[in-house]
A protein has these predicted regions:
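Acyl-donor binding region in acyl/amide transferases
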Residues: 27, 48-51, 58, 69-159
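Short glycine-/small-residue motifs
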Residues: 64-65
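A residue-level signal for beta-strand positions that form part of recognition/binding surfaces
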Residues: 22, 81, 162
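Active-site beta-strand termini and strand-to-loop segments that position acidic
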Residues: 56-59, 167-168
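Short amphipathic alpha-helix that is part of the acyltransferase structural core
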Residues: 15-48
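Contiguous surface segments at macromolecular interaction interfaces
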Residues: 25, 30, 158-168
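Short, Lys/Arg-enriched N-terminal segments with co-localized hydrophobic residues
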Residues: 1-21
Length: 168
């Protein structure tokens, strides 16, 4: 019995490979993306606004979202730069890398020349490296928060030094 090359190649694919092949980038609106972030993100909540959002899906199930908007730092906000404000997945393999890559392709298509994001020092950045991004340094200081003696506040986000990444 002869087997064709397609049958042989099909057997070489692992279940993980097949799963990744079925994932695709889809559009998503900000409300749906924020709902996903509130349910799955480890240390941040929803964002108030965005330029655009993308999702990685398999069929009708969303496995991750990226929310892209103006840079939080006004020093970086030159009109040609966007920031991935949130990237959040349910742990699906390769989903983060797919989202970062799709965000950069969309930003370039819209005429932006730079796309940045920040990770905590405790996060490895493998998804960013896998998507072709480069580490461009660390923030000068850890976040200060908004708590003052005259106006006490409770900080709900991590106040540690962050690593800055840029898409290339």
């Amino acid at each position: 019995q002869r087997r064709c090359a397609a049958d042989y190649a099909e057997r070489l694919l692992t279940r993980r490979d097949v799963w990744s092949l079925m994932l695709r980038i889809t559009p998503i609106n900000l409300d749906e993306a924020n709902a996903f972030v509130e349910q799955h993100h480890r240390h941040h909540k929803r964002v108030p606004g965005a330029k655009f959002c993308v999702a990685v899906s398999q069929g009708d199930k969303v496995h991750g979202v990226a929310i892209i908007g103006r840079p939080v730092s006004r020093i970086v906000d030159d009109g040609w730069t966007l920031e991935v404000n949130r990237c959040c997945t349910d742990g699906t393999r390769n989903a983060c890398s797919m989202l970062y890559s799709a965000a950069w392709r969309a930003a370039k298509a819209m005429g932006y020349t730079s796309l940045i994001t920040y990770t905590l020092e405790s996060e490895g950045g493998a998804s960013l490296r896998g998507a072709g991004w480069h580490c461009v340094g660390k923030t000068k200081t850890a976040g200060r928060g908004w708590n003052t003696p005259s106006r006490p506040r409770v900080d709900t986000h991590p106040l540690q030094q962050k690593i800055k990444w840029e898409a290339v």
